[in-house]
Structure formats: C-alpha cells, structure tokens
Amino acid sequence: MSVTVVLGAQWGDEGKGKLADILAHESQICCRAQGGNNAGHTIVANGVTYDFHILPSGLVNPGCINVIGSGCVVHVPSFFKELEALEKHGLKTDGRIFISDRAHVVFDVHQMVDGLEEVELAGGFIGTTGKGIGPTYSTKMTRSGLRMCDLFDEKIFEAKLRRIAMGYQKRFGDLLKYDVDDEIARYKDLRGKLAPYVVDQIPLLASAKEKNAKILVEGANALMLDIDYGTYPFVTSSNTGLGGVITGLNLGWRSLREVIGVVKAYTTRVGSGPFPTEQLNEIGEKMQSVGHEVGVTTGRKRRCGWLDLVVVKHSHACNDYTAINLTKLDILDDFDELKVATSYSYNGETLEGFPANPEILAQVEVQYDTLPGWKKPTTGVTNYYDLASQARSYIEYIEKFVGVKVKWIGVGPARDHMITRS
C-alpha cells in the first residue's frame, strides 16, 4: 500500500483541491480523515467547476473509491445535498463513496448550538463556520455523541439524541429553538437511504493494503487550524495535521510514501485570530481582489497578507513534509516587490519558533526579507525554466528557508495550470 497525504500548511484555502484532483487520477482510493463540511475547496475539471465540502474530491475520478474516515463528523442532510449537486454536474457516485461507521454525526442541534456558543463568547468569538463541527467534536470527547453505527438502532438513536438535546436545553433554555421530535422523524426517512454508504472502514482499508493500492488522503482545513498546533483557540476542533491522518484512518505510518504541504504564495485567513503578516491596506485589497479570496464554505472575504515563512516552517516541523505544492503564484504577477516573513520578535527579542500564546502572537513584530517582483504573466507556463528569473528566485528562497523542495507550482485556476518539477 502506498499512501500520499496532501495537507494545508497555512490557515486553509491554500488550493489543496487542485493537487488532490491531479493525484486522485493516479489513486484507487481517496480518503478524508478529519473535519466535516466546514472545509471547502473548488476543482475545475473539463471546464466544469465542482465545490467540495465533506466529500473527497476523488469522486471526480470515475475509477476512484472514496472514504469519509472515522475521524470525520458528518451532517447527513448536507452529505446528500452535496452528492446531488455533483450528480447534477454529471458525476456518477454510486458505489464509490463510503462513510466509516465510526464517524460521528452532526445534528441540527449541534449547528444551532454552534451559533449560540459564538454569542456566549461575545468579543472573543472564534469565527466558526456555524456548521456544528465544534459541538459535535465536543459530544464525541464527552462520549455522549452518536456515531454512524448508532443511527441504525432506532432505540439507541432516539435515546442518545434526546439526551444530547436535553443537555443543551438545560444550558441554553429558551434561546435554543430546536425540535428533537422533528429531527428523529427525519431520520426515519434518511436511515434507509444512508445504509448503503456506511461501512466498516477498517477491513476496507486493510484489504486495500493487501492489494497494494494507491491511496490518497486529502487533508481538510490546515495545520494552523489544528486543535493542538494551530493558533488556539482560533482553530477548528480536530487534528488537521499528519496526526489526524493516522488516527482518523487505519493507515500506519509505514505506509506513508509522501506528505505534501500545500502553501499559498501569499497568506490568507478566514475568521478571527492573530495574523502577523496581514495587510490592512491596498496590498491586502489587491491580493483579495486578484486572488478572488472568498471562502467556498462561508462566503466570507479572506484576510490577506504576505507569505509567512515562520508559519510554513512551524507547519513543516509538525507535519514533516516531503514536498511542497506552491499555489496561486500567478496572483503575484503584478507586484513590484514581494515581502516574506522570516522571523518574529517580541519585546525586542527574536522568538525561536511560532508562539503558542495568541496574545504574544498578536503583538509580535515581523521581520521581512524583500524580493523583486517579476511583472510578467505566469498563467499557462508549463516549464519551470520558462518562469521569469525573479519568480524562480522567489520559489527557491522558499525551498531554502523551509528546507523542502517545491515540487508543484500552481499558475492559474484550471487543472492543467500546474508546473511539475522532477
């Protein structure tokens, strides 16, 4: 078995979907290990645009089996809505998408509570997507949540869901406008529809290992949103790095062939939290406009700033990348000069690494190196050496600083707008 992992190296929205799509065409199985439909990316294939949230993008490859792993959380109505949208675009999904019976279920009550918890936080709000991901992982960790396997025992399902609803009702009182009977009734219809998709993931992937299948793992969110190694508390509720891959899927570390970090050529972030290289000026506005930086899941404009190599190096220290996919290089085509963050200082002292304390992170001074822009279009370039020398210098600076080869370079939105270096 040969496993390739594609992970976001920044705060998400790096453009993981394009490389995942390319690699999925070489894979027999494509997996999601963690997260839910709070993730989002777009793939352009054969002139058709597909939006993915909870579903693995390997569905674009008709020969690829797709697995939503045990570490994921699934809102069942959204799962079917996304499937239907893909099928309307001509994708045939029958027999190619499966959900682990150990994955936890996101209910409407989780989504309602998500919003109420943001209100509770007041000025300290996280900027959640409102998809119920955090509350679902919370019930998972308190061992009160429901897994996919629980949905098929009506008595267990009803008792557990009522218990969750009762707990939230005690906490939020009249603020919670939730009808538990309505959701219980809805699953009477969904149960039979869902049954063909739910499987025991462990023998499925064990069989793939015996057959020496090529497996692609598609990371959701990104390392800086990791519950342990990201900018806590402004993070998601799962392990978004390599650790989440190992625990969310029964794939041993010895099966890993390549761990690819996807790095946007500048930095973006959605929601709240410290962002040291953010540009609240014409530079940030230009990146936002030219890069069409609007979230696929939330529709929110992304905050934009210079490439932060302190972030990328921290990400590499956590995930041990074997290669980097640099994306959206073309968005920087019209800049006279480019800055890259190389270190932070706090109270006059240079910091050794990426600070855990968000209060410190919000106050750091950023040290930059300035590199010349190339002022030439890169879109459509297919050979690395056809790029302007300044563009190559930018790429090679990143390689040297992080210590990882940039193997793929995105130079446009289409699937074939990708330079591959040997």
From Swiss-Prot:
Single GO BP term: IMP metabolic process
GO MF assignments: adenylosuccinate synthase activity; AMP binding; GMP binding; GTP binding; magnesium ion binding
SUPFAM superfamilies, per the entry: P-loop containing nucleoside triphosphate hydrolases
Keyword annotations of the record: Cytoplasm, GTP-binding, Ligase, Magnesium, Metal-binding, Nucleotide-binding, Purine biosynthesis
Entry binding sites for IMP: 13-16, 38-41, 129, 143, 221, 236, 300
Gene3D superfamilies tied to this protein: Adenylosuccinate Synthetase, subunit A, domain 1 (3.40.440.10), Adenylosuccinate Synthetase, subunit A, domain 2 (1.10.300.10), Adenylosuccinate Synthetase, subunit A, domain 3 (3.90.170.10)
Domain of life per record: Eukaryota
Active site: 13 (proton acceptor), 41 (proton donor)
A GO CC annotation given for this chain: cytoplasm
Cofactor: Mg(2+)
Record-stated family: Belongs to the adenylosuccinate synthetase family.
Protein name: Adenylosuccinate synthetase
Species for this entry: Pyrenophora tritici-repentis (strain Pt-1C-BFP)
Species classification: Eukaryota, Fungi, Dikarya, Ascomycota, Pezizomycotina
